[in-house]
């Protein structure tokens, strides 16, 4: 494995001492992604699909450095250059994909399954603004969008895309992935995050209030959008169906790639439904299999 300082010099033609904390963060993110890209995927005939509306995965930089077994090494390299790893960790935005115990449970499962070397992946949605970000203005609490996705992020784009049919329109998805590294393992799994193609941030009005009727443009804006009215209720259902349809189509495609004739699908896939949000995957799988 190339030393981080050598990686930085090769990619930037600068030393660690010459870079700002943010520049070091970007280099460290790319360094970790390069290492994880070389790791093979866990494989097996049968695969677990852990479908969840949320994944509270925490900050990924420190977690990935620990799982790769290089945390102390990086800390020492940075200290030698007069830099603080803890300051750089503060720059790393936490993916705003979860809220509480449900999301933390899901994250613990996909973390553990990767460490155990199981062929098992999470499937969810890529919420661009999360639940909300709490800020204080003039001694008052306000909720604002938590725009956590930066130009340089842990998301890995793919070419995978599916058509999800609704009553009056069809949405085309796109899939981004996050590498889930097991603790000191030479293999990895993925967290699969589905998204819409035409997200529109301009639908956000004040705080976290937004136009909930434009489903084609708002579906993956927020985690758990306000469902106190009819439009909010419908948006939640649209989100859940979009998630499970993509998950089911991914499951079927991957099972076929591994040799399934679909009559033996149970020998190729397990589905873990995390709470009620993904429960529509059952009728959706039946719909797809009877087409």
Regions found by a protein language model. Name each.
Residues 1-291:
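A conserved ligand/cofactor-binding region detector
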């Amino acid at each position: 494995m190339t030393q981080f300082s050598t990686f930085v010099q090769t990619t930037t033609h600068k030393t660690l001492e010459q870079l700002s904390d943010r520049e070091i963060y970007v280099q460290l993110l790319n360094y970790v992604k390069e290492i994880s890209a070389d790791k093979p995927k866990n494989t097996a005939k049968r695969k677990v699909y852990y479908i969840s509306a949320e994944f509270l995965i925490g900050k990924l930089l420190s977690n990935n450095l620990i799982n790769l077994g290089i945390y102390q090494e990086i800390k020492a390299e940075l200290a030698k250059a007069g830099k603080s790893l803890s300051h750089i960790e503060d720059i790393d935005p936490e993916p705003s994909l979860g809220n509480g115990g449900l999301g933390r449970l899901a994250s613990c499962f996909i973390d553990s399954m990767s460490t155990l070397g199981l062929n098992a992946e999470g499937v969810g949605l890529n919420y661009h603004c999360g639940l909300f970000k709490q800020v204080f203005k003039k001694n008052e609490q306000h909720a604002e969008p938590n725009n956590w996705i930066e130009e340089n992020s842990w998301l890995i784009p793919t070419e995978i895309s599916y058509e999800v049919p609704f009553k009056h329109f069809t949405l085309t998805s796109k899939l981004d992935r996050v590498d889930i590294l097991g603790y000191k393992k030479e293999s990895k799994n993925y967290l699969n995050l589905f998204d819409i193609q035409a997200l529109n941030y301009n639908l956000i009005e004040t705080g976290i209030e937004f136009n909930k009727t434009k489903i084609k443009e708002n579906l993956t804006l927020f985690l758990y959008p306000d469902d106190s009215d009819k439009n909010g209720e419908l948006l939640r259902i649209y989100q859940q169906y979009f998630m499970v349809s993509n998950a089911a189509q991914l499951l079927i495609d991957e099972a076929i790639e591994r040799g399934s004739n679909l009559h033996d699908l149970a020998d190729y896939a397990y589905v873990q439904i995390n709470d009620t949000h993904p429960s529509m995957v059952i009728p959706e799988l039946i719909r797809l299999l009877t087409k």
